[in-house]
Amino acid sequence: MIAPQPIPRTLPRWQRIVALTMIGISTALIGGCTMGQNPDKSPHLTGEQKIQLIDSMRHKGSYEAARERLTATAQIIADRVSAAIPGQTWKFNDDSYGQDFYRNGSLCKELSADIARRPMAKPVDFGSTFSAEDFKIAANIVREEAAKYGVTTESSLFNESAKRDYDVQGNGYEFNLGQIKFATLNITGDCFLLQKVLDLPAGQLPPEPPIWPTTSTPTP
């Protein structure tokens, strides 16, 4: 079954913004690969180095738990924005591709997707775009909540009526408030081990994932 891959962290930032904001067409931006394909095989790490890296990450908890925490933070931000800006509403993106990206997350730099991923909060769609002043209010709320994760490096690529963007990064996290045709909030976390990897004993590499056949099995 064709499904979106985790978003590569090497994708230029403006492309990631478009991919997340225009979530319905984002499979075209990353190639529409299957989850069975894995472009990040960590060729620069030896097996022992991978084991050491994996074990050093165990204290952080699981990818799945981190994803839930980020989604809770996204809801806090969205609720605060709606309360601060009269008439503004929000909802979690319920598009099937948006849900796929939420489940799959983004690729880590040094570990493959069957070992660890960067969690993504459920994407937030706001009910209307922001005026210049309202965007400042929303960005300030994002700034305050991001700071709780130690995320403080701010930047902006666009600041005009057609396109607005506020981005804050740090500690492996990224919070992005942006609007092109509609306004969205996207949060990506640091690299976390999958729960199935945490469940394995320390000091060893997880088993290689199964290789799925490329052709379907005929039905009797």
Swiss-Prot record:
Topology versus the membrane: Lipid-anchor
Cell membrane found in the keyword field: yes
Residues with lipidation of kind N-palmitoyl cysteine: C33
Cystine connections: none
Superkingdom of the organism of origin: Bacteria
Keywords: Cell membrane, Lipoprotein, Membrane, Palmitate, Signal
GO CC terms of this entry: extracellular region; plasma membrane
Spans traversing the lipid bilayer: none
Gene name tied to this protein: lppB
Protein localization: Cell membrane
Keyword Cell membrane: yes
Residues with lipidation of kind S-diacylglycerol cysteine: C33
Signal peptide: 1-32
Protein name: Putative lipoprotein LppB
Family statement: Belongs to the mycobacteriales LppA/LppB family.
